[in-house]
Amino acid sequence: VVLLLLPVGVSADALPGFRYEDATKFQIINKGWDNTTEPYTRLPQQYMDSCREDQQWLYNHSSGIAVRFATNSKRIAAQYNLKNNFHMQHMAMTGIKGTDLYYLNEERNVWEHVNTARPQEKNFKADSVQSKLYVENLDGEMHEYMIYLPLYDGINWLQIGVDSTAELTMPRVENPRKMGKIVIYGTSIQQGGCASRVGMVPSAMIQREYNLE
């Protein structure tokens, strides 16, 4: 089976015929706890008082978190709402606050990068909504996908866009496997500094390589 992936750079806002669904309906992976106050944060509120102030700032960052889903759509897009929408001089915006779409090549059991959402500055105003058409001209068969979230920003919500008549479901393949989790703690390198895009944070690369969260 050959899946032809044609990444594109057009804003999803400009295209008709999409149906958007809230990403919390699907599988959120690479979190240590499920009882966080928001779906895309990494630490439960009960542990915040014991964290340093700089660690609390990182609490809202979605580094390493991804959403798994399956669809037969010929086009895939996303819209997401950034918490801060700030920038850093020493790191690409695609790493700070972009998103990455990956496709599971089931014949090789390998995740392949499809495309990256390149954030629009929008005057660096907080509460910024970003839109991206990742890919079009797919084969219309059911495939497995994953969207990685920003490394040095957080999101309030994420919507996945597909063709209006397409199926959009929970993943049908168990990848990553449900057999324990890997704990990663360290310097800013583990957070993702200064990866060029969000799928290249060490925790995400380990997840794809070993098929574990």
Task: Name each model feature, range by range.
Residues 1-7:
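Bacterial N-terminal signal peptides
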Residues 7-9, 194:
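Charge-rich, low-complexity terminal tails
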Residues 10-181:
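N-terminal secretory targeting modules
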Residues 179-203:
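Catalytic nucleophile-elbow at a beta strand-turn-alpha helix junction centered on a G-D-S/GDSL motif
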Residues 203-213:
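Short helix-loop-beta junction
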